[in-house]
Design a protein with these regions (language model features):
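Short N-terminal "domain-start" leader segments
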Residues: 1-28
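Low-complexity intrinsically disordered segments
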Residues: 2, 46-69
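Generic structural signal for short, flexible, solvent-exposed coil/loop and linker residues
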Residues: 9, 13-14, 29-30, 45, ...
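Generic, ordered loop/turn and secondary-structure boundary motif
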Residues: 25, 32-35, 66
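A short, exposed loop/beta-hairpin motif centered on an aromatic-Gly-Thr core
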Residues: 32-45
Length: 69
């Protein structure tokens, strides 16, 4: 089990938009859930914030997931 940041594609009528979500995985590595809303970056120090932002940037290199309500 674990989690990471992933880009998710949303539908807004006929338009698509993309947000970064926290995605959670089961013990087999399959998606088990994700945050209802896109996530924001934060941290208790600039280094933590930098690390969080880097994980978000890294998510741009992974396959885009489809957001389903």
């Amino acid at each position: 089990m674990g989690w990471n940041h992933r880009v998710m594609k949303h539908k807004d009528g006929e338009d698509d938009f993309f947000q970064i979500h926290e995605v959670y995985y089961d013990k087999n590595g399959k998606v088990d859930g994700y945050t209802a809303n896109g996530t924001t970056a934060g941290g208790n120090s600039l280094d933590e914030l930098r690390s969080e932002l880097q994980r978000m940037i890294d998510s741009l290199d992974k396959d885009v997931l489809i957001y389903e309500e």
